Design a protein with these regions (language model features):
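Glycine-biased, small-residue-rich flexible motifs in mid-sequence functional cores and linkers
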Residues: 42, 56-338
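Short, small/acidic-rich helices and loops at N termini and domain boundaries
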Residues: 1-60
Length: 338
């Protein structure tokens, strides 16, 4: 595209002209000769019917921040409102899917307070830290953005379907994959470069050693972005990856100000750091979406299509309903129930 100036000129180039450029291998030339735009036009029609926006590097609203990364996406499909990322303090929040309740609460509260201070939150829409980060931003009445590893309408992780709907109405769902494109173990690591590429910095809340969230960190480092980490107990395996990042030079944080002070002089019109220096505290209860995640069977993965099941208490007796409500997602002593 850089050689031809734009995508249109690339697509209209004849096979002979393309061969003379020396840009493509023999295999790529064979694919180019057999290429048609019929599938592309079909995707455009489908996006129009679904109400998705299509953004390419030729568009003025394609983030310059994203265009500067190695291998930027050639296209973004968007459901919702796509902001001017270059004029916003966008912060990525990542972490393990099988996180602790403490990790969920920290992610939720940190995202809420970052949003209240003027930042926008970007994550991956997955279970665990991702979902809690999105929920925190939504609770603050702000915008949040989920970068998916599949087509926007693909039935991925149905347990988070309602959360994705809320995100599309208060932010946007973003993907480089066209409608109906399935999720796989390959698509998620690839999309992580977009999560970090849209943002000024990436926050790791909880990460075991080998966590997929560390792939996002690798991309962020390659892109020259900041890395922030919530420190954890040195004996806690859920923080093994996190603490290793701190050892290697990442910024340990305990308040939203630890993050936002890095950008306040560049975005004073966006940020309000009043109260941001207070430590992260949490006392709010998990949402129903988060409770649903907790009771999800272990065999369900992000690629599964298990329908969301909510507990109906209307058929229970008053005593049974009271007993049910006394239980918690964490351990409960029998003496606390009676």
């Amino acid at each position: 595209v850089h050689h031809f100036g734009n995508v249109k000129a690339f697509c209209e180039c004849s096979p002979d002209q393309m061969r003379k450029t020396g840009l493509l291998s023999r295999t790529e030339l064979n694919r180019f000769e057999n290429m048609t735009l019929d599938e592309c036009y079909g995707i455009i029609d489908q996006c129009e019917n679904l109400g998705y926006n299509i953004i390419t590097p030729n568009d003025s609203n394609y983030p310059k921040r994203l265009a500067q990364i190695p291998n930027p996406p050639a296209v973004l499909y968007v459901k919702g409102e796509f902001p001017d990322f270059d004029d916003n303090v966008a912060i990525a929040m990542v972490g393990t899917r099988k996180c602790s309740e403490n990790g969920r609460a920290i992610a939720r509260e940190l995202a809420r307070r970052l949003t209240e201070a003027g930042a926008i939150i970007v994550s991956g829409g997955a279970k665990g830290i991702d979902a809690s980060s999105h929920v925190g931003a939504l609770r603050a009445g702000g915008k949040t953005f989920a970068v998916l590893g599949c087509g926007i309408n693909y039935p991925y992780l149905q347990i988070n379907a309602e959360l994705r709907r809320d995100i599309s109405e208060n932010g946007a769902l973003i993907s480089e994959y066209p409608p109906n494109f399935p999720s796989s173990k390959f698509t998620f690591p690839i999309r992580n470069r977009i999560i970090s590429g849209l943002c000024l910095g990436t926050v790791v809340v909880e990460a075991v050693q080998g966590s997929g969230s560390l792939i996002t960190v690798d991309h962020a480092l390659e892109q020259g972005r900041d890395i922030f980490v919530i420190p954890g107990e040195i004996s806690d395996p859920l923080y093994e990856g996190s603490n290793r990042l701190i050892r290697d030079g990442a910024i340990a944080i305990t308040t939203p100000a630890d993050i936002l002070c890095e950008y306040n002089c560049y975005y004073p019109h966006r940020l309000n750091l009043e109260g941001a220096e207070l430590p992260i505290a949490f006392s709010d209860a998990p949402t129903q979406d988060e409770l649903d995640e907790i009771i999800t069977p272990e065999f369900e993965t992000e690629f599964g299509h298990t329908p969301k099941i909510r507990t109906d208490l209307s058929s229970l007796s008053a005593d049974a309903r009271l007993l049910y409500e006394r239980f918690s997602v964490s351990k409960v002593d029998a003496f606390d129930i009676v």
